[in-house]
Swiss-Prot record:
Name of the protein this chain belongs to: DNA-directed RNA polymerase subunit alpha
Naturally occurring in which organism (per UniProt): Acinetobacter baumannii (strain ATCC 17978 / DSM 105126 / CIP 53.77 / LMG 1025 / NCDC KC755 / 5377)
The enzyme's E.C. designation: 2.7.7.6
Catalytic activity: RNA(n) + a ribonucleoside 5'-triphosphate = RNA(n+1) + diphosphate
CDD domains attached to this UniProt entry: RNAP_alpha_NTD (cd06928)
GO biological process: DNA-templated transcription
Entry's family note: Belongs to the RNA polymerase alpha chain family.
Gene (name only): rpoA
Length: 335
């Protein structure tokens, strides 16, 4: 008998086992036989190639004109210094590019903590080694950081025939926030059926994105790309469509998912802040006006948001989205 799409088993929940702050195992079961490899391979490729991230793309170093130069007092050569800069894990908030500066006098190590950052830039690995200076050495440089996806060569940023500016060292950029991802398919059982799959995805990020959020974004990309196949039998005449509201899925989650202390959570609900999207639009000043919410609670809220790549005072143009109707808010309030 032919089985329809609705008769296939589908996973009821996703299980995330944290290995460390940047590593996790994501388990999905039960799946029909063969779907473990189908979904695992697709998600793995998207995780490695299609998630947005930030990377250093251009460097200006005082006294250096090209990457084959040397700098007196710097233990590393310029090529090694540039390779170390590629190891920076950077997050950009509400912008596509930013400039970072560094001025360091020896002796001692140069780390990411020595960088001077704009308010909307965060380096999540401040201990990362950039270089080492002798007692007579000094380093002054300016970094350009850009947002992108996948891998971009420095040549692709310049039209053919265009001369590169002297003194601005160009870097190939690996924007992906995923350092490593692999998957395995194991046997699963539901009642009397033993011919099912269990998909286990093992991934490690660079710290700029939570592993669970990375899986969610990859699945969203996959869903958007294959959605058109669902409507193959319908009229294919193109029609003008209104732009869809694009909202990060994490903003639609209730504030309870942040696992704040009871005091902080109750203070937010008293101010009708039920979703993370409601919370991130509030400023520190506004929250401090909330009864019983002090600086300790504010610090807790800021730290939890920062761990998910969010911050207070964000501007959300499409909030609340149409999918979050008023009756949904009332239903949540009545819990």
């Amino acid at each position: 008998m032919t089985r329809t799409a609705n008769e296939f088993l589908t996973p009821q929940a996703i299980k995330v086992e944290a290995v460390s702050g940047t590593s996790a195992k994501v388990i999905l079961e039960p799946l029909e036989r063969g779907f473990g490899h189908t979904l695992g391979n697709a998600l793995r490729r998207i995780l490695l190639s299609s998630l947005p991230g930030a990377a250093v793309v251009e460097v200006e170093i005082e006294g250096v004109e090209h990457e084959y130069s040397t700098l007196e007092g710097l233990q590393q050569d310029i090529v090694e210094l540039l390779l170390n800069l590629k190891g920076l894990s950077i997050k950009l908030f509400d912008q596509n590019e930013a400039y970072l500066t560094l001025e360091k006098q020896g002796p001692g190590d140069i780390t990411a903590a020595d960088l001077r950052l704009p308010h909307n830039v965060e380096v999540v690995n401040p201990e990362h080694l950039i270089g080492t200076l002798s007692a007579t050495g000094s380093l002054k440089m300016r970094l350009k950081v850009s947002q992108g996806r996948g891998y971009e060569t420095s040549d692709s940023r310049f039209p053919e025939g265009e001369t590169r500016p002297v003194g601005r060292l160009q870097l190939d950029a690996s924007y992906s926030p995923i350092k490593r991802v692999s998957y395995t398919v194991e046997n699963a059982r539901v009642e009397q059926r033993t011919d099912l799959d269990k998909l286990v995805i093992d991934l490690e990020t660079n710290g700029t994105v939570d592993p669970e959020e990375a899986i969610r974004k990859a699945a969203t990309i996959l869903q958007q790309q294959i959605a058109i196949f669902v409507d193959l039998q319908k009229d294919q005449t193109p029609v003008a469509q209104e732009p869809r509201e694009e909202v990060d899925p994490i903003l639609l989650r209730p504030v309870d998912d942040l696992e704040l202390t009871v005091r902080s959570a109750n203070c937010l609900k008293a101010e009708n802040i039920y979703y993370i999207g409601d919370l991130v639009q509030r400023t520190e000043v506004e929250l401090l006006k909330t009864p019983n919410l002090g600086k300790k609670s504010l610090t807790e809220i800021k730290d939890v948001l920062a761990s998910k790549g969010l911050q207070l005072g964000m501007r959300l143009e499409n909030w609340p989205p149409a999918s979050l109707r008023m009756d949904d808010r009332f239903a949540y309030r009545s819990r």
